[in-house]
């Protein structure tokens, strides 16, 4: 299973592609889509959408995992982040992919085992889990963490479905 993780942002959108083969997580690619803050906001959203559509076309993931909005005191920033998330979600939906959303707490819990882990702990764990030569750029590392979260969540979901089936056949 190939997963595209996305850390949306109105200026920088991180992406990370991983492959899950059995119990192994394999790094495929990561990077960031940069938008030109001199351009109007709709053009920046288009840049995010087109950049992610190109990544989807290149790597053909089976699923897209997007980090959910964090709480923000700045309403304008929260709205722009929400719109960037929308562009990311639409890229996945138009490609016909299932899109999953995870909170920062869920991502940290899945990667480090602690929902209140520091960003540096998450980055270091991603480096170790994916056998990276160095810590990825911050936004890309966050996106890889979202992808790892989904990989771990899909394993748990599959286990729960199997347990549910076993429970029904034993009843």
Swiss-Prot record:
Q: Which HAMAP family match?
A: RuvC
Chemical reaction(s) catalysed = Endonucleolytic cleavage at a junction such as a reciprocal single-stranded crossover between two homologous DNA duplexes (Holliday junction)
What GO molecular-function term can you cite, just one? magnesium ion binding
- Tell me how this protein assembles: Homodimer which binds Holliday junction (HJ) DNA. The HJ becomes 2-fold symmetrical on binding to RuvC with unstacked arms; it has a different conformation from HJ DNA in complex with RuvA. In the full resolvosome a probable DNA-RuvA(4)-RuvB(12)-RuvC(2) complex forms which resolves the HJ.
- Residues reported to bind Mg(2+) 2: 67
* Cofactor, how bound (note): Binds 2 Mg(2+) ion per subunit.
The entry's protein name is Crossover junction endodeoxyribonuclease RuvC
- Catalytic residues in the record: 7, 67, 139
What is known about what this protein does? The RuvA-RuvB-RuvC complex processes Holliday junction (HJ) DNA during genetic recombination and DNA repair. Endonuclease that resolves HJ intermediates. Cleaves cruciform DNA by making single-stranded nicks across the HJ at symmetrical positions within the homologous arms, yielding a 5'-phosphate and a 3'-hydroxyl group; requires a central core of homology in the junction. The consensus cleavage sequence is 5'-(A/T)TT(C/G)-3'. Cleavage occurs on the 3'-side of the TT dinucleotide at the point of strand exchange.
- Organism for this UniProt entry: Geotalea uraniireducens (strain Rf4) (Geobacter uraniireducens)
């Amino acid at each position: 299973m190939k997963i595209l993780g996305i850390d949306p942002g109105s200026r920088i959108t991180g992406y990370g592609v991983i492959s899950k083969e059995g119990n192994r997580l394999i790094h495929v690619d990561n990077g960031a889509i940069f938008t030109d803050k001199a351009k109007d906001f709709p053009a920046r959203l288009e840049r995010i959408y087109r950049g992610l559509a190109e990544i989807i076309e290149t790597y053909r993931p089976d699923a897209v995992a997007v980090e959910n909005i964090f709480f923000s005191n700045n309403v304008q920033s929260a709205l722009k982040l929400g719109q960037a998330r929308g562009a990311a979600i639409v890229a996945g939906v138009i490609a016909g992919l299932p899109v999953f959303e995870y909170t920062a707490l869920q991502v940290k819990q899945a990667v480090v085992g602690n929902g209140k882990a520091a960003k540096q702990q998450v980055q270091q764990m991603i480096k170790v889990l994916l056998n990276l030569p160095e810590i990825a750029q911050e936004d890309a590392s966050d996106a890889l963490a979202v992808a790892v979260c989904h990989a771990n969540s899909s394993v748990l979901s599959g286990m729960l479905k199997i347990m549910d089936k076993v429970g029904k056949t034993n009843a």
